[in-house]
């Protein structure tokens, strides 16, 4: 499976920017209560049905069933006009769907209304009113799509928080310091029982440019080694004694060059953004602290975007545009751990069986 993930990532060349979005969104409990509702049948077993329905309702309140987890991939290209872009986007869409089939992941393209609903739920996380929209109403009312998805207000007055309507939010970026990454990190982020949106903006680097870049770094490190050796000779001590950092960086750069040249690895520039929202400042701080604790556990640091909250918010919606210039270079295998599309959320409607509490 992991090899298929790597092949999936290697499909994207330098002309395609793609964004992976993982959205934890609180849903209305009334919706779930309607699904698990057991109607009386006017027979001798109605008492049992009532007791069973009461137990299900109690378990629903205990679990994390009110949290809906969604996963999206958004891709974008540069083109002179929409006529030129459309056939390219359709071809890329077809290739991505085929790659998902190889991974065993059911996927489908979203239509315009579904994309607008995602924006509506992102900008109005605590509003329980259902999203209602049709393109015919735009003609009758003179409104545009922004009027249907926007909250009552946006306020970006503070340094590291913002406000959408009655909701307070903050965008942070993940500083990846760990030498090795594990897929458990992303899984723990997505298990947080809070409103959270994780976005990964990924840009593939042209293979020749990546190899040339790493070669130049190796040359720079070798030049620094020679300078240190000259200093050692002039100072009268062993020229083989050089700073340990140079040996470490030199070895890592050579391994990276070998991976790019002979192990089917590509280089990707990754921006990892986290959007936390809550009703109060205290709840927001608690949610950010919980998220930062998971990052710290895996030797990464979650840092708030200072004076870039608006750009961070616009980069946290699935539109395929990244306004944050903070990027980390990762290889294919390091990036592949952020592709958890092989896990599937299960929710069975109709005549289903109760198994346990999640």
Protein language model features and the residues they cover:
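Extended, folded cores of ATP/NTP-driven motor/assembly subunits in large transport
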Residues: 1-341
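N-terminal pre-Walker A segment at the start of P-loop NTPase domains
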Residues: 340-357
